[in-house]
Swiss-Prot record:
NCBIfam families: PRK00595.1, rpmG_bact. It holds the Pfam family Ribosomal_L33. Coiled coil: none annotated. Belongs to the bacterial ribosomal protein bL33 family. The keyword Ribonucleoprotein applies. It comes from Acinetobacter baumannii (strain ATCC 17978 / DSM 105126 / CIP 53.77 / LMG 1025 / NCDC KC755 / 5377). InterPro entries: Ribosomal_bL33, Ribosomal_bL33_CS, Ribosomal_bL33_sf, Ribosomal_zn-bd. Disulfide bonds: none annotated. This is Large ribosomal subunit protein bL33. The keyword Ribonucleoprotein applies.
Length: 51
């Protein structure tokens, strides 16, 4: 089953992406490097719950 998650910028800008992940094949928290347009840099985005 795929669950919706939110990827929040570690730069503290408040920018986030939403995506899905398969909890069965990837039980650990997701960390991925993506572009943050507020600071115009690639930074690490960490998984958080969708509120």
């Amino acid at each position: 089953m795929r669950d919706k998650i939110r990827l929040v910028s570690s730069a503290g800008t408040g920018y986030f992406y939403t995506t899905t992940k398969n909890k069965r094949t990837m039980p650990e928290k997701m960390e991925i490097k993506k572009f943050d347009p507020k600071i115009r840099q690639h930074v690490i985005f960490k998984e958080a719950k969708i509120k």
